[in-house]
């Protein structure tokens, strides 16, 4: 009898933990990443990402110096958490090279296949034919598509577009690089966003002409 009660208590505790991880991004992060050391900036980023998840925030720009966990949060853990919460979601992940974007896709895909993820989101898995790291689907109709800045997004629509460091160090040294990224953004992600969708831009600042600078000026003119 006591053993049965203990099992029920443990099961209830696990269900409560799962619910907390499903609803609170930092709880999910700590569950997936036990060695994670939380800082004040993590709390601020997590609060904003949760607002995106709830549909309260449609545009989010995160500017930080390198080595502050911004990519791990925005391009690895966040899309996985969002897929768990909304497994029919269409996510477009972009960064300055296709190779790097595909690498993020591989990490998210691998995370979804772990026991830790399946414990929190037991109904979510990859579609059986999802082999490629840069283009895969969930069992619930969700889609993940990795792309380099400048690449064609024809035929791709996204509920969530994540742009992580759109400028490489090389392109940041040229004015053309900034203009090319802006042209791609206005002709690609912004046009391909589904109604009600969100865009998250994460980057290290390079110049007032970079994508963050262009967006801030654009929003000031047309909020």
Annotate each predicted stretch with a short phrase.
Residues 1-223:
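Short, flexible loop motifs at catalytic/binding sites
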């Amino acid at each position: 009898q006591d053993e049965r009660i203990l099992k029920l208590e443990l099961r209830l505790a696990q269900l409560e933990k799962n619910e907390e991880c499903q609803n609170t991004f930092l709880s999910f992060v700590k569950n997936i990443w036990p060695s994670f050391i939380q800082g004040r900036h993590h709390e601020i980023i997590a609060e904003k990402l949760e607002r995106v998840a709830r549909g309260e925030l449609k545009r989010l720009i995160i500017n930080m110096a390198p080595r502050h966990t911004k990519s791990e949060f925005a391009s690895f853990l966040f899309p996985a958490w969002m897929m768990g919460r909304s497994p029919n979601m269409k996510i477009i992940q972009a960064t300055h090279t296709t190779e790097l974007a595909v690498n993020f896709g591989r990490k998210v895909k691998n995370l979804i296949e772990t026991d830790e993820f399946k414990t929190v989101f037991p109904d979510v898995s990859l579609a059986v034919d999802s082999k490629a790291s840069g283009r895969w689907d969930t069992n619930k109709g969700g889609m993940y598509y990795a792309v380099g800045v400048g690449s064609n997004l024809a035929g791709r629509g996204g509920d969530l577009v994540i742009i992580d460091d759109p400028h490489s160090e090389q392109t940041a040294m040229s004015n053309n690089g900034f203009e090319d990224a802006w042209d791609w953004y206005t002709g690609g992600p912004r046009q391909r966003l589904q109604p009600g969708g969100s865009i998250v831009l994460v980057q290290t600042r390079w110049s007032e002409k970079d994508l963050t600078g262009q967006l801030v000026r654009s929003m000031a003119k047309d909020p």
